Amino acid sequence: LSYQDQYPRSYYQPYNAQTNPEGYTEGNSTIREHTMLKNAVEFIYDEVPLELDVDGNDDGYVDNVTFLVSGSPDGWSDLLWPHRWSLFSFNVFLNGSIVDSYNLNLASGGYFNVGTLCHEFFHSLGGPDLYHYAGSGPTAAGGWDIMDGSSNTPQYMGAWMKHKYGNWIDCPEITQLGIYPLLPLQYQESSCFRINSPNSNNEFFVVEYRKKEGIYEVNTPGNYSGMLVYRINGNINGNADGPPDEVYVYRPGGTTYNNGNLNDAIFSAETGRTEINDSTDPSSFLYGDFPGGLNIQEIGFPGDIIEFVYWNIFVQTTISG
């Protein structure tokens, strides 16, 4: 289904007195975007089959609509840039349900790919961005999560994102010493664990197994399969305003101020990185460089599963946050 708007492309690009006098300003960008999308929905309304269920949870709203605009994207955060939003300016209906949540994507310029579509659609399911809007601080997750640096073909979002925002998997907490096995992230069960920090009320750790196999995980950073360890701040949703971040992936050389090497973030006997604690590189530091108190050892070889040993050292230091 397609629709051609009454205005030229320049109408939906930023105003410039010399080069684009008909462009939008901060005061009218929303109404221009929403009017265009309203007109598009109304134009194709009669072509949508009446038997098509557009409201799977029966809340009165269309579950989601994706608009694909011809051409390449403009600059980041401009109107013609891939994004997820809400069509709140009008009451627009499809098959008796209100069109509200939508994704806007561009058809060319390198941004129209499965990775971008998945990234934007996970926004519609509640997932936040894991990159920094202002570009400040070290990259927190990078190519380990589709909500930071999406690939084409896309990689998965991390286990914590699946658990918290998708409600697709459980993330059981480890409280006892022992040997623990992990299945690869593509499995629904036994693919992650949560470990609380003894030194923080709001920060904790998540471990997961990233195995380079199948369609989606072969494009993860680096050359190895193995265990990924990252820090979660339970008081924050996403990384857009970070740092501090909700999700931070540990990697050699990574600190509060330095990026380190995300390509080497994998732990395994194959990489030679088989433990993480407050003395290793990377260490299990909390935000603000407080020691995290994590102690994982004897991380094994990646196979059908990967195993690790958890030692709870119960060393209490200054409480962070």
Model-found features: residue ranges?
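A broad, structural surface signal
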Residues: 38-42, 46, 115-123, 267, ...
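Short, Φ-rich (hydrophobic/aromatic) sequence segments
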Residues: 33-44, 156-169, 295-297
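Extracellular hydrolytic enzyme modules, especially secreted metalloproteases
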Residues: 64-66, 70-222, 233-235
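Short, flexible, glycine/charge-rich loop motifs used to bind or transfer phosphoryl groups or to couple energy/partner
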Residues: 55-56, 111, 286
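Active-site-proximal segments of metallohydrolase catalytic domains
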Residues: 1-95
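Short, solvent-exposed loop/edge segments of extracellular or virion-exposed proteins
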Residues: 317-321
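Intrinsically disordered, low-complexity, compositionally biased regions/tails
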Residues: 27, 31, 60, 90, ...
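Extracellular low-complexity, Gly/Ser/Thr-rich intrinsically disordered linkers
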Residues: 186-313
